[in-house]
């Protein structure tokens, strides 16, 4: 199974999705693809941030997100107890603190989302599918991922165990 991160799920919304993602999903099949509640949180955060300056965009993205969730594909994995405990361990790993602590003046604040997505994927025994392998490779150094795949580059960074 693959767990899609926010960057990959966001490509579904584009008028012209990344040319490698659509065929990869068709080949893999929705039954082997999921995302997480963390990605839903990140997508909703994006809607709320856009609502102030770009309400039309926010409304469009919210409609898209509502439709995606109603369709049931990809399935959405919850944050279970084992993933929550693993995430707690990740938060207390000094080498990973930059995922949750950032400079208050930074344009984008760290949310810990990649840690949470990784924790859910690890406890589900699923490979992470991301367009941002760098972050997940940092996590993998401390908490081995079952797999790490970039569907945009069609490249495995951590092969399935």
Language-model segment annotations:
Residues 70-106:
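Acidic catalytic patch
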Residues 118-161:
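Acidic, PIN/NYN-like endoribonuclease modules and their adjacent C-terminal/linker elements
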Residues 11-12, 46, 87-90, 139:
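Residues that scaffold the ATP/ADP-binding catalytic core of kinase and kinase-like folds
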Residues 112-113:
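Acidic donor-binding loop at a coil-to-helix junction in glycosyltransferase catalytic cores
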Residues 51-54, 94-95, 145-149:
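Short, hinge-like loop/turn segments at secondary-structure boundaries
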Residues 31-33, 73-75, 122-127:
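Short active-site oxyanion
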Residues 1-42, 47-65, 157:
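Short, well-structured N-terminal submotif of metal-dependent ribonuclease cores
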């Amino acid at each position: 199974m693959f767990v899609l991160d926010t960057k990959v799920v966001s490509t579904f919304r584009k008028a012209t999705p990344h040319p490698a993602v659509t065929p990869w999903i068709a080949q893999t099949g929705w039954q082997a693809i999921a995302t997480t509640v963390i990605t839903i949180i990140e997508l909703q955060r994006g809607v709320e941030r856009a609502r102030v300056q770009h309400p039309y965009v926010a409304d469009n993205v919210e409609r898209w997100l509502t439709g995606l969730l109603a369709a049931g594909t990809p399935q959405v994995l919850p944050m279970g107890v084992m993933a929550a405990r693993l995430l707690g361990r990740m938060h207390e790993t000094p080498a990973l603190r930059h995922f949750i602590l950032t400079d208050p003046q930074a344009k984008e604040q760290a949310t810990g989302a990649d840690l949470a997505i990784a924790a859910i994927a690890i406890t589900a025994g699923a490979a992470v599918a991301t367009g941002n392998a760098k972050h997940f490779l940092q996590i993998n150094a401390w908490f081995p991922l079952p797999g790490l795949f970039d569907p945009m580059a069609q490249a495995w960074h951590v092969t399935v165990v």
